Amino acid sequence: MVFSFVFKTTALVSALLASLGAAELETVKLTHPDGSSAEVYHFGAHVKSFHPAMDPKLDVLFMSKESNMDGVNPIRGGIPVVFPNFGSAKGFPSHGFARVTNWTLASHKDATDKKNPSVAKFTMAASNSTRAMWPVEFKLEYEVKLYANELKTALRVHNTFSQPIEFHALLHNYLWVDDATNKGVQVSGLKGVEYFDKVAKVNATETRDIIAFANQTDNVYSNAPNTLKAVIKGVNAVDRTVTIKKAGSISGPGSKGVKTETDAVVWNPWADRAKAMDDFGDEEYKNMVAVEPGRVSVKQALPAGQTYTLQETISIAKTKQ
């Protein structure tokens, strides 16, 4: 038997969320000798910000000014960790319980030289609340590494259950954009990839070399290439290119580290959808685009005793003219 999502009542979800409330969200701040910095909430092991050495005043990540910060509801912006479900699943919080759980800070060490990263590691594991929704045993580890102009994150799912499990996993990057209109941001690297358009509810193949935005976009690209780029035109900042490199793998006893396929989600709610979101400003769609690596087109299977790793590197550089 493979244990996938078990649909329970929403009352269990409410009980989980109600137990997590906090007056103020605790964070850990990473700093690097080159001048970069990043901040991560314990709640959701949620990366809040990433300021690169090339421009310490610039946040690579978008954070909504309307976001909930109550330690109960999910945070809108940064890098939410989506697990074990992508989107809606009966009896589960939207995008899973990982992003609305207080994780444990396992370790934190800032770099003492420019060659090495500053690192924070977080953990969470199955609890009575998660078992009520999903009756399996697991442990999650999330590692955040800060370099001068790179942020590396890795989500590790350890199957400590006696049987195989299945899940979705996604790193929901919100990138800061000066102005998403008029080709102010262009995403590339997905031409020829099959995708599901969640707005039109149709399957299609990407024909564009460059994806620009003029309306609501919510595409799930299956088995996407491992390198994606977002070229962002500066308004009060330099023109810049954000590169996302992603990878998935399974390791453990009897496994030498098998590479797995990963997907990519590209999302912008645009004007009408933005107005319908309580935790998102009406005009904030102009200042973000989400480019999200993960495994969500199908559920990721993980044998007992094995570990699944989803990792990404977000790097930033001035756009070459």
How would you label these PLM feature ranges?
Residues 93-148:
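Extended, loop-rich substrate-binding clefts of extracytoplasmic carbohydrate-active enzymes
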Residues 20-78, 232-259, 306-321:
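Beta-strand-rich N-terminal accessory domains
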Residues 1-19, 23:
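Fungal secretory targeting signals
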Residues 296-309:
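Intrinsically disordered, low-complexity Pro/Gly/Ser/Thr-rich segments with frequent PxxP/GP/PP motifs
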Residues 101, 105-107, 118-122, 244-292, ...:
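Signature of Gram-negative chaperone-usher
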